[in-house]
Amino acid sequence: MESAPSTRVLLVEDNEVFREALELMLGIVPDVEVVGAVGDGLAAVHACAKLRPDVVLMDYRLPELDGVEATAAIRECSDAAVVALTATADDAELDALYDAGAVACLTKDSSLEEIVGAIRSASSRGASLV
């Protein structure tokens, strides 16, 4: 029996320790494949074009382009769904991320199960998640 294809994920996080921890945690999830990990918004746009992920897990505060700018740029040139990851769940930040094209927004203290659930939902192109 052939297994279902993995969801290809690009991680965008400027905190190297957090980025590596996310990569390690997602690496144990059988149906998720981390295809790249970058530390700034501009690198995210370039990596998205090159790696063609299904889902981009996007930090809000980033160098070069912030998460809102990078999300908007990715949505203009890619079908990848963007799941935003933010340290604070400020209403203005959330509105800006959704307006830019994010399909879900999570806080950085979300559990692995919550993050994986959002990735799976985003990859199936479901309705926006709250």
Label for each model-derived stretch:
Residues 16-36:
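Two-component/phosphorelay signaling modules centered on CheY-like receiver
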Residues 92, 110-123, 127:
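C-terminal output helix
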Residues 40-43, 66-69:
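Acidic catalytic/metal-coordinating carboxylates
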Residues 59, 86:
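Active-site residues of response regulator receiver
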Residues 49-51, 73-80, 100:
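Conserved phosphotransfer cores of two-component systems
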Residues 63:
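The feature encodes the CheY-like receiver
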Residues 13:
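Conserved acidic carboxylate
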